[in-house]
């Protein structure tokens, strides 16, 4: 029989494991701060220097550029991270890196083709082609950083340091070089230049340990197929959070897009503070579900309790504080953004719900196909509602389209788990934990 006494060696190992998890969480939150919270430092400056119309053009170009980032990144930060983490030897890691690199070359070509089509088909982009191309190219370069590799070897701090450094330098350059609406393309040029430097540094770090191979295109296509489920989810999710300014710009003037963009940046930065926790816990949940399904369910419940409570608090703060927040961050010219911010605050609990039930549970359980169906349906609903509401209700109509489609995604995930008796809150799983 084994005694109930835990030795100092085991206690030390557990403490080190918990410290590593905490360190990863801090590192991922550092990246997220650069991605979401740092714009709150630059947006007050840009909103006052550019004004609603120019900010709307920047928001629309950036939203389309994010489509390019989404296409090139594809979801490798999850699919390739998992493969790197479970690779058996250096040769396998080298093959994964080569396959991802090949896939990103193919995807970059697709993103550039889409940008060329948009430059011809979208009136605002025809009038401002430089803004479009600088936005697209900068976002593509950002997606080339091999963050998946550093996540896979549990060196999240390296990716975090590179990303944060690039964004801080770009932010400083923005204050120095952007002085009026005509300087708007410099915003994307700064982002692209700093991203290119971090891309080079990241690949130098990788090359010191592994030989960089020329990709085999067959393996690149296999990598694309394996990451398809995550790409679909991230595509739908990013339409809710990043691509809406572009969609609105198809139906509304730049000033209206500016009102929406300002409120969306505030909402995304605030609500987005919840997502890094899911990013860190995903690989741990994937590992835990193989050894103890009930423990994995318990961790999912606990995470949802925490994120659910925080998301409700965030939503209430955004709703009640909208006038003060908008005036403080955007300025007096953006009063119409107050209503948009209130509407978007309603999506906070829905985002927490989809992050946990989607990333941390559905995918971990291998329900990629169901995941795809839910996200594609939600994406179609978002697009349909945008087409119906944006022409008539402008920026507030777009905000409602986002909230409704996000809610449908959350309910769809819950219903799927309930029907399959995999709901982590079910009595059966709770009793198994008792």
Language-model segments: which ranges?
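Helix-terminus/linker motif at the lipid-water interface of multi-pass membrane proteins
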Residues: 40-55, 176-180, 238-269, 287, ...
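Membrane-interface junctions at transmembrane-helix termini in multi-pass inner-membrane proteins
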Residues: 129, 139-162, 348-374
């Amino acid at each position: 029989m084994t005694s109930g006494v835990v030795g100092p060696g085991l206690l030390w190992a557990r403490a080190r494991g918990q410290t590593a998890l905490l360190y990863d969480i801090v590192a991922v939150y550092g990246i997220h701060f650069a991605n979401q919270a740092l714009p709150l430092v630059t947006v007050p400056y840009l909103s006052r220097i550019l004004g609603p119309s120019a900010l709307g053009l920047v928001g629309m170009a950036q939203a389309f550029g994010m489509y390019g980032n989404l296409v090139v990144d594809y979801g490798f930060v999850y699919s390739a991270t998992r493969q790197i983490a479970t690779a058996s030897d250096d040769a396998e890691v080298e093959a994964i890196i080569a396959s991802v690199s090949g896939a990103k070359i193919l995807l970059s070509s697709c993103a550039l083709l889409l940008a060329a089509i948009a430059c011809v088909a979208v009136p605002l982009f025809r009038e401002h082609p430089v803004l479009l191309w600088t936005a697209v190219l900068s976002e593509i370069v950002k997606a080339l950083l091999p963050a998946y590799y550093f996540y896979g070897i549990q060196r999240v701090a390296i990716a975090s340091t590179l990303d944060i450094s690039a964004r801080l330098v770009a932010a400083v350059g923005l204050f120095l070089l952007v002085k009026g609406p005509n300087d708007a393309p410099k915003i994307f040029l700064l982002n692209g230049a700093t991203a290119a430097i971090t891309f080079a540094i990241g690949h130098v770090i990788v090359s010191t340990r592994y030989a960089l191979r020329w990709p085999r295109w067959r393996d690149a296509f296999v990598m694309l197929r394996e990451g398809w489920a995550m790409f679909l989810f991230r595509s739908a999710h990013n339409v809710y959070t990043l691509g809406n300014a572009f969609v609105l710009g198809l139906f509304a003037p730049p000033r209206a897009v500016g009102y929406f963009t300002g409120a969306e940046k505030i909402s995304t930065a605030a609500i987005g503070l919840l997502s890094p926790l899911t990013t860190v816990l995903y690989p741990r949940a994937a590992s835990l579900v193989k050894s103890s399904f009930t423990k994995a369910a318990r961790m999912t419940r606990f995470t949802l309790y925490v994120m659910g409570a925080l998301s409700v608090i965030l939503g209430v703060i955004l709703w009640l504080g909208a006038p003060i927040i908008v005036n403080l961050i955007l300025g007096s010219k953006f009063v119409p953004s107050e209503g948009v911010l209130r509407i978007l605050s309603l999506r906070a609990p829905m985002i927490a719900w989809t992050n946990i039930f989607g990333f941390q549970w559905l995918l971990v359980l291998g329900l990629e196909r169901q995941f795809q169906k839910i996200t594609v349906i939600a994406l179609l609903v978002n697009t349909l509602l945008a087409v119906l509401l944006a022409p008539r209700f402008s920026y507030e109509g777009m905000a409602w389209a986002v909230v409704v489609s996000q809610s449908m995604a959350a309910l769809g995930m819950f219903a799927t788990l309930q029907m399959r008796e995999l709901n982590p809150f079910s009595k059966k799983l709770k009793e198994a934990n008792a």
